[in-house]
């Protein structure tokens, strides 16, 4: 069963910042591919959110081609997944959400 996915404002800002970074420092194509990779990962999470708990109550799904982790939690009773943050793995892990 697919879960409803809600993306937090913080995660939206993370996505926007990452997109702009790739667009400015690589190319529009790389930035667009980043968004495609993110969407594929969201689909995987939506279909099966039972990833290992990585940090507090958050689970994490790495993107395939980009050094980012999608931190999320889910409510099994309500069938809702909350995307909390999209964290760049090259940053300090002490700053995890």
Residue spans for each PLM region:
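Basic, Lys/Arg-enriched alpha-helical interface segments
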Residues: 1-57
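Enriched for short, Lys/Arg-rich terminal
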Residues: 73-97
């Amino acid at each position: 069963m697919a879960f409803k996915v809600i993306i937090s404002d913080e995660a939206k800002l993370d996505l926007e910042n990452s997109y702009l970074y790739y667009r400015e420092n690589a190319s529009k194509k790389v930035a667009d591919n980043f968004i495609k990779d993110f969407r594929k990962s969201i689909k995987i999470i939506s279909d099966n959110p039972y990833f290992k708990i990585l940090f507090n109550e958050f689970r994490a799904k790495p993107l395939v081609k980009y050094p980012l982790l999608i931190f999320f939690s889910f409510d099994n009773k309500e069938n809702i997944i909350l995307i909390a943050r999209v964290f760049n793995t090259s940053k300090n892990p002490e700053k995890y959400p």
